[in-house]
A protein has these predicted regions:
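Bacterial signal peptide processing site
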Residues: 20-23
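Post-signal peptide N-terminal segment of mature Sec-exported envelope proteins
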Residues: 28-46
Length: 125
């Protein structure tokens, strides 16, 4: 009888996990860079179709441009995001070297399924 209760509890746990939210659509919640900057590739479970970069208060103008091979480039302050066309699930995040002497933070917002995924990007001083 005790095994049945344990099995039922385990099954209930699996059902609750399966019905939960998609957890930022598989994209990382946070990415960190050292003061030297660099490049990181991140991906999610579902494709996104728009990217913007802002600070915590929503400030910052994302400049969009087109690169080679249909690459879209989004830049705001010290951070650049490159990705291939709409509905891609992979992006390249590039941080410039930090010469400010202060830790800095920006947020990458991706539109996924009429909702959004948010990636907090930090860089050490």
């Amino acid at each position: 009888m005790e095994k049945k209760h344990g099995l039922a509890a385990l099954l209930l746990l699996f059902l609750l996990v399966a019905c939960g939210p998609s957890g930022n659509y598989g994209y990382p919640l946070k990415i960190g860079f050292g003061r030297e900057g660099g490049t990181k590739i991140c991906s999610g479970k579902e494709g996104f179709y728009d990217v913007s970069i802002n600070d915590y208060n929503g400030n910052g103008e994302t400049k969009l441009s087109k690169g080679e091979n249909d690459t879209i480039i989004a830049t705001c302050y010290w951070l650049t995001v490159k990705y291939k066309g709409p509905f891609n699930n992979e992006m390249k995040i590039i941080a410039e070297p930090n010469t400010t002497g202060k830790k800095r933070t920006l947020y990458v917002y991706c539109m996924v399924d009429n909702s959004g995924a948010t990636i907090k990007v930090t860089q050490s001083k």
